[in-house]
């Protein structure tokens, strides 16, 4: 669930009135890391690929990025495209290239978002804590964003790798994050998707700078405007976003959630699905009772509470966070935080990967009754009976079955479904991407997913079985598989039994009745 975000707009209905589009999670732009040996698969000019609107998105002539850069290994893959390492031909300098497939931008809204992302990165160019954009290019098939390569990895990866942690270290981290928030706000930008995955270290050096990336959901601040787009990622979204009336204060809330996780290893709000997380966020009850909170300083808890204040008008500002005694006054102690916090953080990260895999494999075993009308919907869209649907067929289906599927849901399918990046969605990808409707956290569905992964039916998922499934569903590299096994296998026998599997599926999302966190 941590690797999902939503983007929804108010739209006009046929009668001219405004209707709300429901909250439906969709996948964020850049997701799991992939092996070094994978090479870019840029669509060949010889392969005809349909683009709905022949006009350019960036408003400038098409350019072949390969005239200026050689594209190397794949760094990450998301709903809209792929990020590669690239080398500038003229200088030999190394950058990252985010290639966004135009065929996945199914609406004018999506195209505007890409333009806004580029404009915001250009606007913030030169700011030390912001990933620098080098240039943007467009060809018939993709929009390419060339930007600074941050080789130091994600925030949580660095913290976990260090193996030790303190409040003083957490204070330094949150200062860097809120520095970014202040820079954005002073320059008239709301980020709207602050989360640990979007903070990268510039290099592997110990003193490397922490930088913010991914402005795909960001917006320019307009004086007096009340924002209504439901955007962000479930664990980190502010309550006023869910109420569809907010401003720049939402970034402080998200930073507060990150601080809470830094101090205890788990998010402050969880439930058994995304909708349940939203309910808990709206309740806004913060737990400072369970371990390790009794040993966390009062000053740290005071700052968390002020950053997670429900009323945005009363919430602390970025400038006030930076002046808080825990940040500026040296009140954050250097005493190491309990090692279980790092353990929980690792499990929280691994849980997201395993849940994503389980959703995909569960789609295979859903009954006709559980799938309800989705099979018919897929068949109606698959007009040539090829067993797959293209984005154009998906759009046509939207027009023909408007009462059955909203444009937001189609965008969700586009960004979340096409696992192998081949430009089409097969039946099980389609079902998997809509499975949030079917309460698949229930034990019966968890058991079905476990059985699917347990190929030899011996009651355990082995490393080979997990590796096979993760690669089959386009999710696995060696590091990801090793991480999931090590975090789920609580009895250290090298295998995952059903109880371990079920516990991980509920980790970080099911509110415990006792006084224990879901991660131990």
UniProtKB/Swiss-Prot annotation:
Location of region: Disordered: 1-21
InterPro entries (UniProt xref): CDPK_Ser/Thr_kinases, EF-hand-dom_pair, EF_Hand_1_Ca_BS, EF_hand_dom, Kinase-like_dom_sf, Prot_kinase_dom, Ser/Thr_kinase_AS
GO molecular function, one term: protein serine/threonine kinase activity
Binding site for Ca(2+) 4: 489, 491, 493, 495, 500
Lipid-attached positions, N-myristoyl glycine: 2
Residues found modified as Phosphoserine: 233
Top-level class of the enzyme under EC nomenclature: transferase
All residue ranges annotated as the EF-hand domain in the record: 369-404, 405-440, 441-476, 477-511
Topology class, membrane: Lipid-anchor
PROSITE patterns in the cross-refs: EF_HAND_1 (PS00018), EF_HAND_2 (PS50222), PROTEIN_KINASE_DOM (PS50011), PROTEIN_KINASE_ST (PS00108)
GO cellular component: membrane
Segments of this protein annotated with the region Autoinhibitory domain: 332-362
Chain sites annotated for binding Ca(2+) 1: 382, 384, 386, 388, 393
A Pfam family the protein falls into: Pkinase
Protein EC: 2.7.11.1
Notes on how activity is controlled: Activated by calcium. Autophosphorylation may play an important role in the regulation of the kinase activity.
Catalysed reaction, written as an equation: L-seryl-[protein] + ATP = O-phospho-L-seryl-[protein] + ADP + H(+); L-threonyl-[protein] + ATP = O-phospho-L-threonyl-[protein] + ADP + H(+)
Positions annotated to bind Ca(2+) 3: 454, 456, 458, 460, 465
Record's keyword terms, sorted: ATP-binding, Calcium, Kinase, Lipoprotein, Membrane, Metal-binding, Myristate, Nucleotide-binding, Phosphoprotein, Repeat, Serine/threonine-protein kinase, Transferase
Biased composition (Basic residues): 1-10
Residues binding Ca(2+) 2, per UniProt: 418, 420, 422, 424, 429
Entry's family note: Belongs to the protein kinase superfamily. Ser/Thr protein kinase family. CDPK subfamily.
Subunit structure: Interacts with SLAC1 and ABI1.
Comment, domains: There are 3 contiguous domains conserved in the CDPK subfamily: a kinase domain, an autoinhibitory (junction) domain and a calmodulin-like domain. The autoinhibitory domain (332-362) inactivates kinase activity under calcium-free conditions.
Free-text function comment from the UniProt entry: May play a role in signal transduction pathways that involve calcium as a second messenger. Could act as a calcium sensor involved in drought- and salt stress-induced calcium signaling cascades. Mediates the phosphorylation and activation of the S-type anion efflux channel SLAC1.
Name of the protein in question: Calcium-dependent protein kinase 23
Source organism per UniProt: Arabidopsis thaliana
């Amino acid at each position: 669930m941590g690797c999902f975000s939503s983007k929804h707009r108010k739209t006009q209905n046929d009668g001219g009135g405004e209707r709300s589009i429901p909250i439906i999670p969709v996948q964020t732009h850049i997701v799991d890391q992939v092996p070094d040996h994978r090479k870019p698969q840029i669509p060949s000019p010889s392969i005809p690929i349909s683009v709905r609107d022949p006009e350019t998105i960036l408003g400038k002539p098409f350019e072949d990025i390969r005239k200026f850069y050689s594209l190397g290994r794949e760094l990450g893959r998301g709903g809209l495209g792929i990020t590669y390492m690239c080398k500038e031909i003229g200088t030999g300098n190394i950058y990252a290239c985010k290639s966004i497939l135009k065929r996945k931008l199914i609406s004018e809204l999506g195209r505007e978002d890409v333009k806004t992302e580029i404009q915001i990165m250009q606007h913030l160019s030169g700011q030390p804590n912001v990933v620098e954009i080098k240039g943007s290019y467009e060809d018939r098939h993709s929009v390419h964003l060339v930007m600074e390569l941050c080789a130091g990895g994600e925030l949580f990866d660095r913290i976990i790798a260090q193996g030790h942690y303190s409040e003083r270290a957490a204070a330094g981290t949150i200062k860097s994050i809120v520095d970014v928030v202040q820079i954005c706000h002073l320059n008239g930008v709301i980020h709207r998707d602050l989360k640990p995955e979007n903070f990268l270290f510039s290099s592997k050096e110990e003193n490397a700078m922490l930088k913010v990336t991914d402005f795909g959901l960001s917006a320019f601040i307009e004086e007096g405007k009340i924002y209504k787009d439901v955007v962000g990622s479930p664990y980190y979204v502010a309550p006023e976003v869910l109420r569809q009336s907010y401003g720049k204060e939402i970034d402080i809330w998200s930073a507060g959630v990150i601080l809470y996780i830094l101090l205890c290893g788990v998010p402050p709000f969880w439930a058994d699905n995304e909708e349940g997380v939203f309910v808990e966020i709206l309740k806004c009850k913060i737990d400072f009772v369970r371990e390790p909170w009794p040993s966390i300083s009062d000053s740290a808890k005071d700052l968390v509470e002020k950053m997670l204040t429900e009323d945005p008008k009363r919430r602390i500002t970025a400038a006030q966070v930076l002046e808080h005694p825990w940040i500026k006054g040296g009140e954050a102690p250097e005493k190491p935080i309990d090692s279980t916090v790092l353990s929980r953080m690792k499990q929280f990260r691994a849980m997201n990967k395993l849940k994503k895999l389980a959703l995909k494999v569960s789609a295979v075993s859903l009954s006709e009754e559980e799938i309800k009308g989705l099979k018919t919907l897929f068949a109606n869209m698959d007009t040539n009976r090829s067993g797959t649907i293209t984005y154009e067929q998906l759009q046509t289906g939207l027009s023909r079955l408007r009462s059955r599927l909203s444009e937001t849901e189609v965008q969700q399918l586009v960004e979340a479904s096409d696992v192998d990046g081949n430009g089409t969605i097969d039946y099980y990808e389609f079902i998997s991407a809509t499975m949030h409707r079917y309460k698949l956290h229930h034990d019966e569905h968890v058991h079905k997913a476990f059985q699917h992964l347990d190929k030899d039916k011996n009651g355990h998922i082995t490393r080979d079985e997990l590796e096979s499934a993760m690669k089959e569903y386009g999710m696995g590299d060696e590091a990801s598989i090793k991480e999931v096994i090590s975090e789920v296998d609580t009895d250290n026998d090298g295998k995952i039994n059903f109880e371990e599997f079920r516990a991980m599926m509920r980790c970080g999302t099911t509110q415990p009745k006792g006084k224990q966190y879901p991660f131990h």
